[in-house]
Amino acid sequence: MAANRRLFTSESVTEGHPDKMSDQISDAILDEILKKDPNARVACETTVTTGLVLVSGEISTSTYVDIPALVRETVKEIGYTRAKYGFDFETCAVLTAIDEQSADIAGGVNQALEARQGKMSEEEIDAIGAGDQGLMFGYACDETEELMPLPISLAHQLSKRLADVRKEGIVDYLRPDGKTQVTVEYDENDKPERIDTIVISTQHHSEIQNEQIERDMIEKVIQAVVPSELLDDKTKYFINPTGRFVIGGPQGDVGLTGRKIIVDTYGGYARHGGGAFSGKDATKVDRSAAYAARYVAKNIVAAGLAKSCEVQLAYAIGVAQPVSIAVNTFGTGKVSEDRLVEAVRELFDLRPAGIIRMLDLRKPIYKNTAAYGHFGRKDILFPWEKTDKTEELIALTK
């Protein structure tokens, strides 16, 4: 590789990966609760292992949800429908261990510190406090149409295609578990130039030979997703490099909610505050503020104010206003970062209640986020992916 060039790699996993199964179950439960009780407080964690699903957490709601039925339906949709897959929606055990949200936490969330101290106007008094302290990042760049880094974008598309060819019977020997990984080579101007390496590991029936899997993955998955101009005779393909992937899903690995936080976001291309998303209602700023930070960053890039933008938000538990807002444009900004921070403060209400209203986060939209990325999706336009603040940002930064 020539000087001043670089490689960057991101990975994704399919909906049948055990960690992603856990995320989808947690968000399916969240959505079902929000359908009947939009103001519910939900922190739902799922563990999947051989023959067992354990759902635990803290849920405060006025409604009833049949959690075991939801679990089985979600597992069925993912594709674990036969015992020979190592996990079956009909025969798996489902255990629940649910408590209510701590009264100490609820007190600070229900009424923010500013309200308790009389520092809010009547119009602001309904503002809720942050559900926890923490820092969250959002990112956008102009590498793709959806303003995402190319490596994670392609990795997600490959994972989604891997599931699609299985469900549609195009490749009928596949099973639900799978992973993808894409290495992109960037040129001297830090622009994506070619794909250096693609890795696909996919669960399969025991009688299939690896040669057929490799041929089908290249022809029916990779070539259907990756633009041909990014592939060349030097691109390396590693298809099931262990040689065999029959045992997978919860039988092969324990799955836990929140263990794929880099897959969920930017594939390592931007920083991460450490908080997971799935199973959490929007009062949890781990989720809602990360969505808001993406919304801000994407609008800054879409407005042409920067080619690359990372936004950091930080909160204190029980306090409505963020304790800090930071913008980094990595030298690509058309205006100063200080000016961008001023514009962000003026245009976006980044209190938890403000984020919930701005992005309409009390709706049951979360299960669809739980596989193939929360950001930059081509199949679904989530509220935080809209670029409806560009004109106002431009006007505020003139």
Swiss-Prot record:
CDD domains: S-AdoMet_synt. It comes from Oceanobacillus iheyensis (strain DSM 14371 / CIP 107618 / JCM 11309 / KCTC 3954 / HTE831). Homotetramer; dimer of dimers. Catalyzes the formation of S-adenosylmethionine (AdoMet) from methionine and ATP. The overall synthetic reaction is composed of two sequential steps, AdoMet formation and the subsequent tripolyphosphate hydrolysis which occurs prior to release of AdoMet from the enzyme. Pathway: Amino-acid biosynthesis; S-adenosyl-L-methionine biosynthesis; S-adenosyl-L-methionine from L-methionine: step 1/1. Its cofactor is Mg(2+); K(+). One of its GO terms (biological process) is one-carbon metabolic process. Pfam families: S-AdoMet_synt_C, S-AdoMet_synt_M, S-AdoMet_synt_N. Residues 1-21 are annotated as: Disordered. This is S-adenosylmethionine synthase. The keyword Cytoplasm applies. It comes from the Bacteria. HAMAP family: S_AdoMet_synth1. L-methionine binds at residues 58, 101, 253, 284. It catalyses: L-methionine + ATP + H2O = S-adenosyl-L-methionine + phosphate + diphosphate. The gene is metK. Keywords: ATP-binding, Cytoplasm, Magnesium, Metal-binding, Nucleotide-binding, One-carbon metabolism, Potassium, Transferase. Mg(2+) binds at residue 19. The lineage of its organism: Bacteria, Bacillati, Bacillota, Bacilli, Bacillales. Binds 2 divalent ions per subunit. ATP binds at residues 17, 177-179, 244-245, 253, 259-260, 276, 280.
